[in-house]
Amino acid sequence: MKLGPGKKAPDEINVFIEIPMGSNIKYEYDEEEDIIKVDRVLYTSMVYPFNYGFIPETLEEDGDPLDVLVLGNYSLMPGTVIEARPIGMIYMRDEEGEDAKVIAVPRNKTDPSFSNINDVKDLPEAIRNKIVHFFEHYKELEPNKWVKISGWGSVAEAKERIKKAIERKKQG
């Protein structure tokens, strides 16, 4: 994939969408094959509350690109890219270790509906609760899988995480 993290990263980022809002299928981008594959159907009767993907040309310590949940009122097709603004982080661990995710909203030019949201603290409590509930429960029926949420991070923490993930990828 030739797409980078975004010309204005970490303030605005490219997010490659793997999983559309409302899907109960976990898709994953296979970098080697350059295709999106079905990883699995969620075992729980849940759907992704928002569009989910990653920032291209980033690398987390677990060897994967930095994950992003993009808030919105519409479902995006897998394989599309949306320019988004990070507004914070959700810190979590799963059976494989730390698995934090950036929380983002579409950039104002793409969708001005979120122009007043600059930090996860600005989100209605109901939306924060929906995100936590999804990630706490979406793996519950899968053998030997679990998730533990440890809290929220600010927009500054998200931008720092993005910078580090970009640098880690550049260093190889």
Swiss-Prot record:
Cofactors (names): Mg(2+)
Entry binding sites for substrate: 26, 40, 52, 138
GO BP terms in the entry: phosphate-containing compound metabolic process
Residues that bind Mg(2+) 2: 67
Any Pfam family matching the protein: Pyrophosphatase
GO cellular component: cytosol
Alphabetized PROSITE patterns for the sequence: PPASE
EC number(s) reported in the record: 3.6.1.1
Keywords recorded for this protein, A-Z: Cytoplasm, Hydrolase, Magnesium, Metal-binding
Gene Ontology MF terms: inorganic diphosphate phosphatase activity; magnesium ion binding
PANTHER family: INORGANIC PYROPHOSPHATASE
Function of the protein: Catalyzes the hydrolysis of inorganic pyrophosphate (PPi) forming two phosphate ions.
Family classification: Belongs to the PPase family.
Annotated protein name in UniProt: Inorganic pyrophosphatase
Upper taxonomic lineage: Archaea, Thermoproteota, Thermoprotei, Sulfolobales, Sulfolobaceae
Record gene name: ppa
